[in-house]
Structures are given as structure tokens and as C-alpha cells.
Swiss-Prot record:
Keyword Glycosyltransferase carried by entry: no
Cellular-component GO terms for this entry: cytosol; plasma membrane
Region (G4): 126-129
Origin organism lineage: Bacteria, Pseudomonadati, Pseudomonadota, Gammaproteobacteria, Pasteurellales
Region described as G1: 17-24
Keywords of the record: Cell inner membrane, Cell membrane, Cytoplasm, GTP-binding, Membrane, Nucleotide-binding, Ribosome biogenesis, RNA-binding, rRNA-binding
Region (G3): 64-67
Originating organism: Haemophilus influenzae (strain ATCC 51907 / DSM 11121 / KW20 / Rd)
Domain of life, per lineage: Bacteria
Identification of the protein by name: GTPase Era
GO molecular function: GTP binding; GTPase activity; ribosomal small subunit binding; rRNA binding; small ribosomal subunit rRNA binding
Membrane topology: Peripheral membrane protein
SUPFAM superfamilies: P-loop containing nucleoside triphosphate hydrolases, Prokaryotic type KH domain (KH-domain type II)
Assigned protein family: Belongs to the TRAFAC class TrmE-Era-EngA-EngB-Septin-like GTPase superfamily. Era GTPase family.
Main location as per UniProt: cytoplasm
Length: 302
């Protein structure tokens, strides 16, 4: 039975930053489970992922965005940038994540976009455990403080969880009095079908290393429950060239077998249900440059 409170609090929080600074890792750490995929490759997140954390009277609704970056040559990159930018406009708090003291032109671009934001901005300096000379941190903070009026500046390690609880205290202070938007047991508003495609895509990123560029996506062609209660999931992996198809399949089909086994294990943990997963690979030339095709695959800019 849901506990009743005299007052409840709720708010929307956008997690923004350039690609590969740890936004998805931070969201997963806050939620206590993986809902947003992570990889050492930049721009792993392609969709706005909504993560929900409810504790007692407080509900935090997080938007984990694709990484904002300057390069916009392909249609998929333009859509991802627009999706990330639109997340900034309608939230109660913005968490701007940067990678230690590594500041570049993409960070500067994100900062300039935040100048028009109505919500307060918290700077989360991630991966501080990787900063070898901690004496570099204070001048870096001083320099950024002169560029922008941040509400708070919090050094964190999203991977290890260092100082993440301090960030959450700030988040909770930003919540407004109001009704909760989701039931207390929800951790995301995304469907199981969507989460299945994201899990497969994460394994693709992980097991193809640097071999496979970002011209790969996953379409769930079937997601049904059979008479035994098992989830039967068919995933179609789309690549742009025949050579990429061979990379995904691997010698003797070993790579796609590994991808499938690892993805199935993650799905069974997330869905708490037995899963039968089948994967196919198909060449669809130019899909990442075709906005109509991207929208049909679920890539939206709003």
C-alpha cells in the first residue's frame, strides 16, 4: 500500500554535457540500476532517457540527454543535438556534467546554450578520481565560476559514487511542491521494447570495440510473451555497409552470439523474466543520414 503524505514534491532535472563525460553513468548511479546505456565511445546515448527516483514524498524525474557537440554533418547528429537542447528548456534544475579538468570547444558550446536556461545550473565535475594533480582542480573551478553563475559546483565520481549523495541533496532542494507524475515503483517511462533495443545496442558498442562506427541501430521487430510466460524478442541490427555486418557477426558467428548472450542476461535482470532473444543483422545504406528513416526508428528531436 502506498504511504500517504501531507505534502509531496516533484521536479524535472536535465543532465547535460558533451559526449562521453559520464551523464548516463551518473543517472544509473542515482537510480541504483542501469536504465541508460554506457560505453567508452562518445555519444552512446541517442534518445532522451527519462529516469525516475521516488523516495517517500519526493519524486525526481531525470532526463539523460544525448551529448551535445559541434559536429552536425549527419542527420542523426542533428536530431541528437536538438533532442539534447530541447531538454534544457522545461526543467526545474540542470546538471551540467564535465570530464574532470578536460575542457574543450564542445563544453564551451554547452555552456553557451545554458546561458538562456531559466532553471538553475549545477556544475558536476565528474571523474575527479582520475585527476592526478588535485592542485589543478581549484584553478579550474575558479575559471569556470568566472564564466557562469553556477548555483552549485560539485566534484564527483559517478563511477564510484563519490559525492553523488551531495548532488542528490541539491536536487531534492530544487523539487517543487506538487503531485507525483509517476507511480512510486517506476524507474523509467520507456517501454520494455525500447529498453531491449538499448541493451542490445550497448552490447554492440562494447563488443565491437572501436571497429564499428555509430552507423548502427537496433529495431525490435517482435516483443511478445509466449504460453510459458517467456519474453520472445527478435532484434534487427541495422548497419550501413556489408563490412560492418561482418564485424557484428564475427568469425563463425561468435561475436553476435556473445552479444546476444550478454544482452539476454541483462534483459532477464531488468525485466525479472526469462527471455528468448534472436538477433539478425541487415545492411540498410544511408539510414543515419535520412531524417524520415530516423524518425521511423524512434529518433525524435523533441
Amino acid at each position: 500500500m502506498t504511504e500517504q503524505f501531507d505534502k509531496t514534491y516533484c521536479g524535472f532535472i536535465a543532465i547535460v554535457g558533451r559526449p562521453n563525460v559520464g551523464k548516463s553513468t551518473l543517472l544509473n548511479k542515482i537510480l541504483g540500476q542501469k536504465i541508460s546505456i554506457t560505453s567508452r565511445k562518445a555519444q552512446t546515448t541517442r534518445h532522451r532517457i527519462v529516469g525516475i527516483k521516488t523516495e517517500g514524498a519526493y519524486q525526481e524525474i531525470y532526463v539523460d540527454t544525448p551529448g551535445l557537440h559541434i559536429e552536425e554533418k549527419r542527420a542523426i547528429n542533428r536530431l541528437m543535438n536538438r533532442a539534447a537542447s530541447s531538454a534544457i528548456g522545461d526543467v526545474d534544475l540542470i546538471i551540467f556534467v564535465v570530464d574532470g579538468t578536460h575542457w574543450n570547444a564542445d563544453d564551451e558550446m554547452v555552456l553557451n546554450k545554458l546561458r538562456n536556461a531559466k532553471a538553475p545550473v549545477v556544475l558536476a565535475i565528474n571523474k575527479v578520481d582520475n585527476i592526478k594533480n588535485k592542485d589543478d582542480l581549484l584553478p579550474f573551478i575558479t575559471d569556470l565560476s568566472s564564466k557562469f553563475n553556477f548555483a552549485h559546483i560539485v566534484p564527483i565520481s559517478a563511477q564510484r559514487g563519490n559525492n553523488v549523495h551531495e548532488l542528490e541533496k541539491i536536487v531534492r532542494q530544487s523539487l517543487r511542491e506538487g503531485v507525483h507524475h509517476f507511480p512510486e515503483d517506476y524507474v523509467t517511462d520507456r517501454s520494455q521494447r525500447f529498453m531491449a533495443s538499448e541493451i542490445i545496442r550497448e552490447k554492440l558498442m562494447r563488443f565491437t570495440g572501436e571497429e564499428l562506427p555509430y552507423s548502427v541501430t537496433v529495431e525490435i521487430e517482435q516483443f511478445k510473451v509466449n504460453e510459458r510466460g517467456t519474453y520472445e524478442i527478435n532484434g534487427l541490427i541495422l548497419v550501413e555497409r556489408e563490412g560492418q555486418k561482418k564485424m557484428v557477426i564475427g568469425a563463425g558467428g561468435q561475436k553476435i552470439k556473445t552479444i546476444g548472450m550478454e544482452a539476454r542476461a541483462d534483459m532477464e535482470r531488468l525485466f525479472d523474466n526469462k527471455v528468448h532473444l534472436e538477433l539478425w543483422v541487415k545492411v540498410k545504406s544511408g539510414w543515419a543520414d535520412d531524417e524520415r528513416a530516423l524518425r521511423s526508428l524512434g529518433y525524435m528531436d523533441e
